[in-house]
């Protein structure tokens, strides 16, 4: 019946004068391999992606290290900050002393990240480092509260901790709220008659991803796993550079005991004054060890990015200004950091940095293969500052040192922040001269750009480095700035060109990945969430569909012997095809960006005989519609089937592709 409906629709379209587009797929000759790393994910701590997001810690400013030491905390009674605590790089702690007013208790109340989302019946692990300075005993009372309730009792649940001795020790308790609440607070009450010191106050759900104590929020990590990422780029883009060198991302600060990982500012807390979050910092609870663990969990190749000694060039355009960029002659510590990172990931457990990894619970190497040097860096020509090769001169020093000691590591350079223009044109040939293995392209562009760049990679130099499309998304005009259906559809169209050119494009990652609905600075994003719920944008599903149907080899697909890339006469169609040796399937992806349904005839050269094919379709009428927390599955891919007909020379599919739709055909050969 479905097949009959398809024929009738096709006939109706043809009778109305619509041209049938013939897509020729050559299944007899395999093209370039599709790299396992082709479709991946890129994590940057923007939009509260780490603290308040993927990292499951519920307490904000748990070690009192924010510049405002009580940021995130409400205080009552006699509470002061001291700076001689047990952790060298996080020395501050809170002293909770008697108030001098009878039984009145000193109290700390943490508001979390836009509140604390807690679920009824689930256990939460409270922990604190504490001591009684005079060596006696004291009790801490721990409450999870709804402090806005009109009910008789604010407490959702409570527990107690007995503290004893003048030495710092870790104490734990389990809290189990009876009801679910999105905006809970954590209260810590001190003994009214004894001084108690507290440090690193923490609250985690016990049900984290893989059950790890310093773990990830389970639903968000699961969403990443479900994307089937072949590569995982981390820890970010601009945060790698830092506003200045002091605030750059330093991986060594993110490993070892979590209590001793020093706080760093997050450059995204002040970048946009219209979305200003002054209490947005990086606790580094989610550090390089945890990133490598996630790569292992997901089956992804790790792609860490390190500072090249240039802070953000947007904010510091003059490279001669003292203190914002490292002089070439002073690069050695930065290069050593890169070498040490490779040892941390791959070195034996008895090496200096391999030992750190082993002590964290992973004596086996992580088998790192890729390393990015720099983010959106660039050189200058005479017409644009005249400062010369400030990036590539530094990149060469990194490359020489890394190639000498670790020749098997694949190095990734960059062509700067733009997908075309003087800086891109300057850097692209220099990446070839430096013989980097891949270079990282970034493009956040509008609808017109995505519609007109379907052939972007067809003319790229095949003799140079491979391409990593490391950050991209369609940023629609006006209200399309959100994750609307139409912009996601254009991303799907663009990705046919990425796939068709798998011989030159080896990696591609959409960006950004995460956004908290109350704490975002940048949109669109792949995954949105609040403290309890999450939803996957349409862009997420586009990425997932490509990753789950990437195949193993490109198959040539043409219309009138031309690539199907929205060219003149193709009526807004984009298409690509791959062979999947694992499943024995020919996979054809077709995107119709046009306003009308398009009848298509897909000729499957090399396949004979009728059969039924599986389809997956992403189609929606409202171009401005999107998924939301309240309607998380408003727009999702739909499975189906279609009939493959037995032609005289080749099997074929007749279909009427709906307007503004993306359809995948999976044909057993």
Residue positions per predicted region:
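Catalytic-core region of carbohydrate-active enzymes that cleave or remodel glycosidic bonds
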Residues: 397-401, 407-410, 429-433, 437-549, ...
């Amino acid at each position: 019946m479905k097949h009959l409906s398809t024929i009738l629709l096709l006939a109706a379209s043809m009778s109305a004068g619509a041209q049938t587009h013939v897509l020729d797929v050559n299944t007899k000759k395999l093209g370039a391999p599709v790299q396992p790393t082709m479709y991946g994910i890129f994590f940057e701590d923007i939009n509260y992606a780490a603290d308040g997001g993927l990292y499951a810690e519920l307490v904000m400013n748990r070690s009192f290290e924010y510049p405002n030491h009580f940021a995130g905390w409400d205080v009552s009674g006699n509470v002061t900050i001291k700076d001689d605590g047990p952790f060298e790089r996080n020395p501050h702690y809170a002293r909770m002393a008697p108030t001098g007013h009878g039984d009145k208790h000193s109290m700390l109340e943490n508001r979390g990240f836009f509140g604390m989302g807690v679920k009824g019946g689930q256990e939460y692990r409270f922990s604190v480092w504490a001591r009684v300075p005079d060596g006696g005993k004291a009790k801490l009372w721990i409450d999870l509260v709804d402090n806005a309730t009109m009910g008789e009792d604010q407490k959702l649940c409570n527990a107690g901790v007995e503290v004893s001795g003048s030495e710092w020790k870790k104490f734990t308790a389990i809290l189990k709220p009876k009801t679910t609440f999105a905006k809970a607070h954590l209260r810590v009450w001190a003994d009214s008659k004894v001084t108690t010191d507290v440090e690193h106050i923490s609250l985690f759900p016990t049900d984290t991803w893989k059950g790890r104590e310093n773990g990830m929020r389970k639903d968000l990590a699961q969403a990443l796993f479900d994307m089937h990422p072949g590569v995982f780029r981390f820890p970010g883009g601009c945060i790698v550079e830092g506003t200045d060198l002091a605030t750059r991302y330093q991986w060594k600060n993110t490993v070892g005991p979590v209590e001793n990982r020093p706080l760093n500012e997050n450059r995204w807390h002040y970048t946009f004054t219209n979305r200003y979050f002054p209490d947005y910092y990086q606790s580094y609870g989610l550090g390089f060890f945890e990133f490598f663990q996630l790569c292992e969990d997901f089956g992804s190749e790790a792609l860490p990015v390190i500072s090249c000694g240039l802070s953000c060039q947007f904010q510091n355009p003059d490279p001669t200004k003292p203190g914002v960029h490292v002089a070439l002659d002073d690069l050695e510590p930065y290069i050593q950091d890169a070498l040490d990172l490779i040892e941390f990931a791959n070195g034996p457990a008895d090496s200096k940095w391999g030992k750190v990894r082993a002590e964290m619970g992973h004596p086996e190497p992580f088998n790192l293969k890729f390393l990015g040097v720099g983010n959106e860096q660039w050189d200058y020509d005479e017409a644009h500052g005249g400062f010369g090769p400030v990036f590539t001169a530094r990149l060469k020093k990194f490359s020489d040192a890394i190639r000498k000691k670790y020749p098997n590591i694949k190095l990734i350079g960059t062509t700067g922040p733009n997908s075309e223009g003087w800086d891109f044109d300057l850097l692209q040939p220099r990446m070839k001269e430096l013989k980097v293995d891949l270079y990282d392209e970034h493009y956040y562009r509008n609808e017109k750009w995505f519609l007109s760049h379907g052939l972007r990679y067809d003319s790229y130099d095949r003799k140079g480095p491979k391409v990593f499309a490391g950050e991209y998304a369609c940023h629609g005009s006006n209200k399309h700035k959100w994750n609307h259906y139409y912009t996601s559809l254009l991303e799907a169209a663009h990705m046919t060109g990425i796939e068709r050119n798998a011989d030159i494009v080896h990696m591609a990652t959409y960006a950004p990945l995460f956004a908290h609905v109350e704490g975002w600075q940048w949109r669109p994003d792949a995954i949105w969430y609040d403290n309890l719920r999450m939803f996957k944008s349409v862009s997420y599903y586009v990425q997932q569909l490509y990753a789950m149907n990437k195949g193993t080899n490109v198959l040539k697909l043409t219309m009138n012997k031309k690539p199907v890339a929205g060219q003149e006469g193709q009526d807004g169609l984009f298409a690509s095809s791959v062979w999947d040796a694992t499943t024995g399937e020919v996979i054809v992806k077709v995107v119709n960006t046009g306003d009308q349904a398009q009848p298509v005839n897909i000729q499957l050269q090399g396949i004979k005989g009728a059969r039924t094919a599986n389809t997956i379709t992403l189609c929606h009428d409202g171009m401005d519609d999107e998924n939301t927390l309240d309607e998380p599955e408003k727009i999702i891919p739909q499975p189906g089937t279609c009939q493959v007909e037995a032609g005289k020379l080749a099997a074929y599919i007749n279909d009427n592709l709906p307007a503004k739709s993306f359809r995948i055909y999976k044909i057993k050969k």
